[in-house]
Amino acid sequence: MIGRIQGTLVSVHPPRLLVDCQGVGYEIDVPMSTLYQLPEVNQKITLLTHFQVREDAQQLFGFATEIEREAFRQLIKISGVGSRTALAVLSGMSVNELAQAIALQEAGRLTQVPGIGKKTAERLCLELKGKLAPDLGITGGKPQAIEATSEVLQALLSLGYSEKEALLALKQIPPETSVSDGIRMGLKYLSKP
């Protein structure tokens, strides 16, 4: 198995890179989050990789961080989620956003990713629940904190704020905040001009 590639970045044609490693050019598919962290062409690059062998193809997938690679590996374990879909998920949201959506069972956030329908999003929430955050070392929070965050989100939505506004406000609230303090802080943030 190929676990890491270090070489010179030759070309970028999203989502594919060409990396020269001692005279051998490796085509590597990467999520958008990794593309944003790339150096300039002809610069040195190191990518963590996942090597996939199927009966009709051998593919390399590259990631800037171990957390991204592990999230990819968790995603492709799910029935009906292939490597392309897993890359689309990691391109559409950060690993922390994915872990939070799974922890809060927010299938609606996952359907915003191109190629992810309602059934697939629900399957992701069901099958990754309790797996993603602990495996990746992501602090999804204690169950009480997750419950409080969900209640704050619901309160802001019921007050007429859009999901986008409510999620922006949630990012400003510390994870261990109580529901009432979270709502107060969220409203204060949203009332700023």
From Swiss-Prot:
Residues 144-193 are annotated as: Domain III. It comes from the Bacteria. SUPFAM superfamilies: DNA helicase RuvA subunit, C-terminal domain, Nucleic acid-binding proteins, RuvA domain 2-like. One of its GO terms (molecular function) is ATP binding. Keywords: Cytoplasm, DNA damage, DNA recombination, DNA repair, DNA-binding. InterPro entries: DNA_helicase_Holl-junc_RuvA_I, Hlx-hairpin-Hlx_DNA-bd_motif, NA-bd_OB-fold, RuvA, RuvA_2-like, RuvA_C, RuvA_C_sf. It holds the Pfam family RuvA_N. It is found in: Cytoplasm. GO terms for cellular component: cytoplasm; Holliday junction helicase complex; Holliday junction resolvase complex. SMART domains: HhH1. Residues 139-143 are annotated as: Flexible linker. Belongs to the RuvA family. The RuvA-RuvB-RuvC complex processes Holliday junction (HJ) DNA during genetic recombination and DNA repair, while the RuvA-RuvB complex plays an important role in the rescue of blocked DNA replication forks via replication fork reversal (RFR). RuvA specifically binds to HJ cruciform DNA, conferring on it an open structure. The RuvB hexamer acts as an ATP-dependent pump, pulling dsDNA into and through the RuvAB complex. HJ branch migration allows RuvC to scan DNA until it finds its consensus sequence, where it cleaves and resolves the cruciform DNA. Has three domains with a flexible linker between the domains II and III and assumes an 'L' shape. Domain III is highly mobile and contacts RuvB. This is Holliday junction branch migration complex subunit RuvA. It comes from Polynucleobacter asymbioticus (strain DSM 18221 / CIP 109841 / QLW-P1DMWA-1). The gene is ruvA.
